[in-house]
Amino acid sequence: MSEVLATYLLTDTTDSEKRAEQIAAGLTVGSWTDLPLVKQEQLRKHKGRVVKVEEKEGTSENETQSVITIAYPEVNFSRDIPAVLTTVFGKLSLDGKIKLTDLEFSEGFKRSLPGPKFGIYGIRKLLGEFERPLLMSIFKGVIGRDLADIKEQLRQQALGGVDLIKDDEIFFENELAPFETRIIEGKQVLKETREETGHKTLYAVNLTGRTAELRDKARRAAELGADALLLNVFAYGLDVMQSLAEDKEIPLPIMAHPAVSGAFTSSPVYGLSHALLLGKLNRYCGADFSLFPSPYGSVALPKESALAIHDECVKDDVFHPSFAVPSAGIHPGMVPLLMRDFGIDHIINAGGGIHGHPKGGEGGGKAFRAIIDAVLEAQPIEEKAASCKDLQLALDKWGRVEAV
């Protein structure tokens, strides 16, 4: 019988085994021990079962914690993520200190999900770059700016050698720089910079609006030649992203932004784990890129959580691996640490670390590219900076975070 396995962290539960049995029955058949034997036989295939209960040390002296895993028969729900989440963590999410930390799906269930359309290799193939972490920059301070300002910002970032440029997640449809115009004009700017430098850059445009409009808007973006889509997935829902990823008329990579996810993941004892929501479920539902706070930036995640997201993005599975994109407060001096912790197959994503460079976006991009090359070539950073003024200026401004 096919099942979905849900793993939870319980906090301050006096009898974990009893609690696990209550959850297994309560979220499937309801009461069990009070049922007559005939009814029990009829409902047995629908009943959840406790797979394991493990006690663990709490985070404080007076706190008790346990990890439980419960198997839910797939016969109880349709093969979609909303049905699963409602079953395993619907009303349960309102019932005390309990956190959903993982979900394991059957191979049959996985076949009903799209996974990333491009994945790491597909994105690298689009760019023709296979040997280093990719570099992404973000539009900053664009609200209230006209199209000319935005085009110049795009141009400067591309001249700096970044591989991807994304809209800010709070850059919505507006009359100064409409969605379709940004795509058309942005493509022309990037065409010109590629002719000038030989370097290809992709632009991810923010897909926004009412949910019912998104599919048609994304299809229109594809018709206009958009490179990729940015989606505030947790404002809309994972199922919305899945629908976009499954649509054959939207042959575009999807970049999943973590906005709003903190409401679900930030508590150590409530909600969902970062790895499950930003890693596994993002990947399964079609994200080619999953953005999340890095462990050492301005909005930092615990390092263990950030690395767990990355692991879920790239571990062997039936789906293409997704690019992990640790973000927030990234500057060139952090690159050795990023590459040590996240390896080659991740994206270095910077906003202020590029735009705040003394020589602007172009200088910021060049500084990042220089230090990436230095790490790959095992060249001392000081030696690289001596031959690259842009890198030296960046290190003078932000310093260097040592990889210890």
From Swiss-Prot:
Binding site for substrate: K140, K166, D167, D168, E169, H257, G329, G351, G352
Catalytic activity line of the entry: 5-methylsulfanyl-2,3-dioxopentyl phosphate = 2-hydroxy-5-methylsulfanyl-3-oxopent-1-enyl phosphate
Domain of life of the organism encoding this protein: Bacteria
Pathway: Amino-acid biosynthesis; L-methionine biosynthesis via salvage pathway; L-methionine from S-methyl-5-thio-alpha-D-ribose 1-phosphate: step 3/6
Positions bound to Mg(2+): K166, D168, E169
Modified residues (N6-carboxylysine): K166
Gene3D superfamilies: Ribulose bisphosphate carboxylase, large subunit, C-terminal domain, RuBisCO large subunit, N-terminal domain
Pfam families in the record: RuBisCO_large (PF00016), RuBisCO_large_N (PF02788)
UniProt-annotated catalytic positions: K91 (proton acceptor)
Cofactor: Mg(2+)
Leader sequence segment: none
Isomerase found in the keyword field: yes
Cofactor note: Binds 1 Mg(2+) ion per subunit.
Family membership noted in the UniProt record: Belongs to the RuBisCO large chain family. Type IV subfamily.
Function of the protein: Catalyzes the enolization of 2,3-diketo-5-methylthiopentyl-1-phosphate (DK-MTP-1-P) into 2-hydroxy-3-keto-5-methylthiopentenyl-1-phosphate (HK-MTPenyl-1-P).
Name this polypeptide is given: 2,3-diketo-5-methylthiopentyl-1-phosphate enolase
Organism from which the protein derives: Bacillus velezensis (strain DSM 23117 / BGSC 10A6 / LMG 26770 / FZB42)
Lineage start: Bacteria, Bacillati, Bacillota, Bacilli, Bacillales
Name of encoding gene: mtnW
